[in-house]
């Protein structure tokens, strides 16, 4: 079983007197930084000039170029996109990564796949909230928190776990639960979840269901409502209480169809495809493919994204959502 940590297991004093340099001010950067600041910790932002820097300033932070922030920081949390981290690290962080500093991540991709190789005389840790930045912030403001993972790759100072737990407490994660993992486990399971289930699996399943109904002559609007719009209702129930709560809330007809037809949709071929996807992640094949894709300016990424944006389900969804008051901006 995984080690689990809560409020009493972490102490913000382990970060007192230290400067936390958060590199990047996107969704996670903004959410984590504001929580840390409101927890009484000293946070600065390392970011290039632009709208995000202006936003960080308006949120009350001291902002610096990345190199200057890395120089000032005792703890350096890298929250720029995965594909940019290695270049930013080599050019603007590595020269200032002196002994006993702490290098921190919220995803293990670049450490696990060797794109960033820190010196041996620093701590290398991960604190990974299991939710987007706006949720990290919102739950904190509500007096709650999102769960998080911590991992220790290097413990040069002997205090790496204390720092990880203190940071997790600073962003509100110990109000929920903090689980200890490894960079390898977090990276491989996170990528698999995104590709096979949460993003790739769900979107492909929805499109397949939509296309099946439309090809059979049903109205695209009906297909959209049945396979996409109602998805949130089901997922919310599962999120709140697992499959049991969801099945308690649906009709007996729906439940019978669920337990007898679902395994025909996600059958042996799907399991085999999932195993292949997991192997591509474990072997580094996916990482290599994604790194090379970025080196040539993402032609496949751009083409496939454009194709999905032009799918009929997006056109129909846009029209229907425009009629629904819950999606109208005030």
From Swiss-Prot:
Q: How is the cofactor bound?
A: Binds 2 magnesium ions per subunit.
The record, for Pfam families, names: KARI_C, KARI_N
The KARI C-terminal knotted domain covers which part of the protein? Answer: 182-327
Q: Which Gene3D superfamilies match?
A: 6.10.240.10, NAD(P)-binding Rossmann-like Domain (3.40.50.720)
GO annotation terms (biological process):
isoleucine biosynthetic process; L-valine biosynthetic process
**Residues forming the catalytic site:** 107
Q: Where is the KARI N-terminal Rossmann domain?
A: 2-181
* Residues that coordinate or bind substrate: 251
Q: Which SUPFAM superfamilies match?
A: 6-phosphogluconate dehydrogenase C-terminal domain-like, NAD(P)-binding Rossmann-fold domains
Going by the entry's taxonomy, the superkingdom of the source organism is recorded as Archaea
EC number(s) on file = 1.1.1.86
Pathway given for this chain reads: Amino-acid biosynthesis; L-isoleucine biosynthesis; L-isoleucine from 2-oxobutanoate: step 2/4; Amino-acid biosynthesis; L-valine biosynthesis; L-valine from pyruvate: step 2/4
Obligatory cofactor(s): Mg(2+)
Ligand binding (Mg(2+) 1): 190, 194
Q: Which InterPro entries match?
A: 6-PGluconate_DH-like_C_sf (IPR008927), KARI (IPR013023), KARI_C (IPR000506), KARI_N (IPR013116), KARI_prok (IPR014359), NAD(P)-bd_dom_sf (IPR036291)
Q: Which UniProt keywords apply?
A: Amino-acid biosynthesis, Branched-chain amino acid biosynthesis, Magnesium, Metal-binding, NADP, Oxidoreductase
Might you report a single GO cellular component term? cytosol
Which transformation does this protein catalyse, written as a reaction? (2R)-2,3-dihydroxy-3-methylbutanoate + NADP(+) = (2S)-2-acetolactate + NADPH + H(+); (2R,3R)-2,3-dihydroxy-3-methylpentanoate + NADP(+) = (S)-2-ethyl-2-hydroxy-3-oxobutanoate + NADPH + H(+)
Positions binding Mg(2+) 2 in this chain are 190, 226, 230
Binding sites annotated in the UniProt record for NADP(+): 25-28, 48, 52, 82-85, 133
**Its job:** Involved in the biosynthesis of branched-chain amino acids (BCAA). Catalyzes an alkyl-migration followed by a ketol-acid reduction of (S)-2-acetolactate (S2AL) to yield (R)-2,3-dihydroxy-isovalerate. In the isomerase reaction, S2AL is rearranged via a Mg-dependent methyl migration to produce 3-hydroxy-3-methyl-2-ketobutyrate (HMKB). In the reductase reaction, this 2-ketoacid undergoes a metal-dependent reduction by NADPH to yield (R)-2,3-dihydroxy-isovalerate.
Query: What's this protein's name?
Result: Ketol-acid reductoisomerase (NADP(+))
- What is the organism field in this record? Methanocorpusculum labreanum (strain ATCC 43576 / DSM 4855 / Z)
Lineage from the top down? Archaea, Methanobacteriati, Methanobacteriota, Stenosarchaea group, Methanomicrobia
């Amino acid at each position: 079983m995984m080690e689990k940590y809560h409020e009493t297991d972490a102490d913000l004093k382990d970060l007192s007197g230290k400067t936390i340099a958060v590199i990047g001010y996107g969704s996670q950067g903004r959410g984590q930084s504001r929580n840390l600041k409101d927890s009484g910790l000293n946070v600065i932002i390392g970011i290039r000039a632009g709208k995000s820097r202006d936003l960080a300033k308006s949120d009350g932070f001291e902002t610096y170029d990345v190199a200057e922030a890395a120089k000032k920081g005792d703890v350096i949390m890298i929250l720029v996109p995965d594909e940019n981290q290695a270049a930013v690290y080599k050019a603007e962080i590595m020269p200032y990564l002196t002994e006993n500093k702490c290098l921190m991540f919220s995803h293990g991709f670049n450490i696990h796949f060797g794109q960033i190789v820190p010196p041996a005389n620093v701590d290398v840790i991960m604190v990974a909230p299991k939710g987007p930045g706006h949720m990290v912030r919102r739950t904190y403001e509500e007096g709650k928190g999102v769960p998080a993972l911590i991992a220790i790759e290097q413990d040069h100072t002997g205090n790496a776990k204390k720092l990880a737990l203190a940071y997790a407490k600073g962003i509100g994660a110990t109000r929920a639960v903090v689980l200890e993992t490894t960079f390898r486990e977090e990276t491989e399971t996170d990528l698999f979840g995104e590709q096979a289930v949460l993003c790739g699996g769900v979107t492909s399943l929805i499109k397949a269901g939509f296309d099946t109904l439309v090809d059979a002559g049903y109205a695209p609007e009906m297909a959209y409502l049945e396979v996409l719009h109602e998805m949130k209702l089901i997922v919310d129930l599962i999120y709140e209480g697992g499959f049991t709560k969801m099945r308690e809330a649906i009709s007996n007809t729906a439940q019978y169809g669920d337990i007898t037809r679902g395994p025909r949709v996600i059958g042996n071929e799907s399991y085999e495809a999932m195993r292949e996807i997991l192997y591509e992640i474990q072997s580094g094949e996916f990482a290599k493919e994604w790194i090379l894709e970025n080196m040539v300016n993402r032609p496949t990424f751009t083409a496939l994204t454009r194709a999905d944006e032009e799918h009929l389900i997006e056109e129909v969804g846009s029209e229907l959502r425009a009629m629904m008051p819950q999606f109208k901006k005030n």
